Amino acid sequence: MAIQSKYTNTQVEALISELLAVLAKHQAPTDLSLMVLGNCVTHLLENKVPSESRQAVAEQFAKALVKSVK
């Protein structure tokens, strides 16, 4: 989603591949997959982002997500 990233494409693609493999292993339908991934995002925001930054980070993430599907 990011235009520039401090992470390599290899790092990003490896994580994507592993996450999708887990969803496939569990034969998770699209709605369940999106729900689980959304809950993961919420978990990361609540546990890894300082409370004073959460709203802004969540909004940036949401904007990037919308932009990525246009």
UniProtKB/Swiss-Prot annotation:
Q: Which InterPro entries match?
A: UPF0352, YejL_sf
What HAMAP family does the database record attribute to this sequence?
Answer: UPF0352
Family that this chain belongs to: Belongs to the UPF0352 family.
**What is the protein named?**
UPF0352 protein Sden_2336
